[in-house]
């Protein structure tokens, strides 16, 4: 089990938009859930914030997931 940041594609009528979500995985590595809303970056120090932002940037290199309500 674990989690990471992933880009998710949303539908807004006929338009698509993309947000970064926290995605959670089961013990087999399959998606088990994700945050209802896109996530924001934060941290208790600039280094933590930098690390969080880097994980978000890294998510741009992974396959885009489809957001389903």
What positions do the PLM features span?
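Generic, ordered loop/turn and secondary-structure boundary motif
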Residues: 25, 32-35, 66
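Generic structural signal for short, flexible, solvent-exposed coil/loop and linker residues
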Residues: 9, 13-14, 29-30, 45, ...
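A short, exposed loop/beta-hairpin motif centered on an aromatic-Gly-Thr core
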Residues: 32-45
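Short N-terminal "domain-start" leader segments
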Residues: 1-28
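Low-complexity intrinsically disordered segments
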Residues: 2, 46-69
């Amino acid at each position: 089990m674990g989690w990471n940041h992933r880009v998710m594609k949303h539908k807004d009528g006929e338009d698509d938009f993309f947000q970064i979500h926290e995605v959670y995985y089961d013990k087999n590595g399959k998606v088990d859930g994700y945050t209802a809303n896109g996530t924001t970056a934060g941290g208790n120090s600039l280094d933590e914030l930098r690390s969080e932002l880097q994980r978000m940037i890294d998510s741009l290199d992974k396959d885009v997931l489809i957001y389903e309500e």
